Amino acid sequence: MVDRKEFAELLYGTIINSTNSKENAFEKLSKIRGWLLANTPKRLFRFRRCNEYSIEALKEDQIWGTSIWEFNDPYECVPCYNFETLWGKITQSLESQKFFQLINVLKEGGILPEIKMAYPSIDIEQMIKNIPDVIDEKDVKEKLDILKKYLSIFIGTSFEEMVHRFYIGIQAEEAQKQIACFSEQNNSTLMWGHYADSHKGFCLEYDFQSILKECTQNCIDIRCCNNFMLNYSLAPIIYTKERFDATAYFSTVMQALLYEKNQIPMDLYYEDILIVSKCMLTKSIDWEYENEWRLFTPNFNDEYKPYRKIASLRPVALYMGAKITKENESVLYEVCKNKGIKCFKMLQDFHGKEFIV
């Protein structure tokens, strides 16, 4: 089994924001890509029901994905936020001491590349030239206090709209992707029961190592890459007791609403561009038995479809459930025979003490 704790530390610890250069983003994403190339299992399994769609997909070497809106867990890919943490950062940034530290750094020519990267439409040099040589500290403190009070009122009156935009926005982004789920094992009684029609279905074995490669697309901005710079976005699920904390995304939602209502022509600052990927790879520990790996696509920026073909890959083996009907067994056997796919049937072990097939 793969070390999911190690992957969690790597993924959650990788922060790519609006101030990161393309080179810096490439370096960070390369570490995730390297881990995935080194740790993707040789064998991954997908459990299927016997129906016309799954059998036709088998015949055509197709892997179909599903929108998160069709998943059975209501908390699937649904993050949380911590407003106290966010407000603490806001009030801290509005302290007069912090403000003067920033002014001094700007005057000395510091952090200019990062600010330009985050806010490309702003003339930073001209803004710095407009900073007076002498600043009235008392006046600045009063204005910062006024700004803090305004933000407090703004948040109080707009909070419900922020929360609505937070959940709708992030789930709309996730719904533009399609997901196919795989497991590291094919002998789980629960998996056969939940996803293969109580052993009346079948399980497909895939070799993703044979096709998983570094992406060769020359993207304009690597910072927006949610594929981890691979030709297929394939990664293990991280099982946790708590939903993923997407407070960084809530911060962007707050900015957008603030700029919109006050007609401020500024670029949005993104604190963590990998937020959506992190949400889609976080799942309740209740599902830990699945040992899931998730294949997901880039965004489909068109009309919503609950199911789509997302990859073409022939399975290397097929395992029929112990309770499969004779008719379906015959159909699957013929498909495997014609396509050169190894075919097995799961059997109950009546001699041992364990609940295994």
Per-range role (PLM):
Residues 1-357:
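Partner-binding and oligomerization surfaces adjacent to conserved cores of proteins
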